[in-house]
Amino acid sequence: MSFPYLTWIVFLPLVGAIIIALFSGGREKLIRYLAVLFTSLPLILSLVAFSVFDRSAAATGVMQFQEKISWIPAMNANYHLGVDGLSLPMVVLTAFLGLVVVFISWKEHLRVREYFVWLLLLETSILGVFTSLDLLLFFVFWEVEIIPMYFLISIWGSGRKEYSSIKYVLYTLFGSALMLAGILSLYFTTGTLNMVELAGNGMAIVQSVMPAVAIFFLLLIGFAVKLPVVPFHTWLPDAHTDAPTAGSVMLAGALIKMGGYGIIRVCLGIFPSVARDYAPFLLTLAVISVLYGAAVTLRQTDLKRLIAYSSVSHMGFVLLGIFALNEVSLTGAALQMVSHGLLTGLLFAMAGLTIHNVGERDLRKLGGLARQMPAVAVVFSIAGLGSLGLPTTSGFAAEFITFAGAFSSTLVAGAPVFTILAVIGVVLGAGYILWLIQRVFYGPVKEEYNAVKDADGLEKIYMFAMVALIMLVGIYPAILTDIIKLGIAPLAGLLGG
């Protein structure tokens, strides 16, 4: 039997959380180093898996590093893990951000033990979603994620943290209830929870209990809440605004990607003909999300809230790539998820650092901080320009591939029109990003901020590591797209694109 990479990657953070939970109070330094250890190991293992991943043509559509053990025989449910070209980049991204948020949290002093327990449990739950090949196991990991995110926002957040955390839970549970109904409908119709077996055969066997269209939309709405898609988006700005910085980075960087991943893996894989039939409607929602998110962003005065609404717009690009339904657009959507995770994760990290060092988040009161915080200003500018699609950054590569694929789609009537409308969102994005950078870091220097400190050595390490990855993917996107295509090609074949 081969080495169980995925079990170790998924559960090492949980092991770390359990060990930290057993500690008594007052050992903050040791707790931090343990958190580094138990997030570094999954990252190392995920990079090893990435390096030995079979990229040959024969591996197209093949789940690699599979582990399968009978779990609940009465339901034909299994502990079944595996990754393909779609999920492996998401695993590496989550493991990387898991380590980054530990460094971001280095100066956290409130209930440190509980804080890192929840942070590590959050990482395990997200990794579990991206590696599960059994729908029940997938759902369990999906639900577990709610608990640590709730506590991270409600205890270590700011502002209306209790309201935002409860709103997050209610929205997520609403989506989860619909998703569970869809999963149970699939199970009672097919007798299997195996995502590999269902992919490609779903429409042939999903007919008797309820219409396939109904199951498709039950699952789709559950995923759309998490992505989020307008009109299911209103929890996101509140959660981001009031979450601690580490929570915002994981939320934007990895957690909302679960929604896009679920749509591609489950909705498109099992219901390709339904996806084709309703693609124009869903592309309309994508364009609405892009334009609405960008337009509302222009009116924000809170630093983190502005970045949160930009995420709504960028997830619209993901939805556009998904429901253009061809191989290029789907590859672009998957790359956009990774790119957005790096870029917006970095934006939230820099926003949190700015708010922490300056003590102010109102954009009307900020300005001229580039003199006091040159490193933060440079990194924030790179992340911001990457978000609007600056060449040599991951944002440009992801948006270009997504738009090229969507514009050339022959499966969806009016795809070029939807694409052109979505490109308007990039123009609006340039407006709010450039205004944000100018407002926070340039303009008149304010005397009250003369004593503000720049990023310290540890902060510069993770800042520039993220910048390096953003530039690497931007200059050489094939490092990811060559793998992503192996997972996307079979889906595109099912869809006819």
Label the model's feature ranges:
Residues 103-118, 245, 253, 442, ...:
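Cytoplasmic juxtamembrane regions at transmembrane-helix boundaries
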Residues 373-375, 433-497:
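Cytoplasmic/organellar membrane-interface segments at the starts of transmembrane helices
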Residues 9-12, 92, 113-122, 308-312:
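Short hydrophobic alpha-helical membrane-embedded segments
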Residues 29-40, 163-173, 373-378, 457-465:
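Alpha-helical transmembrane segments and their helix-start/interface "positive-inside/aromatic belt" motifs
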Residues 100-106, 124-136, 149-438:
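Hydrophobic transmembrane alpha-helices and their helix-loop junctions in integral membrane proteins
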Residues 1-5, 19-103, 107-117, 192, ...:
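Transmembrane helix-loop-helix hairpins at membrane boundaries of multipass inner-membrane proteins
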Residues 7-22, 36-49, 93-105, 122-124, ...:
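Central hydrophobic cores of alpha-helical transmembrane segments in multi-pass inner-membrane proteins
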Residues 37-54, 172-183, 376, 380-388, ...:
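Hydrophobic alpha-helical membrane-insertion segments
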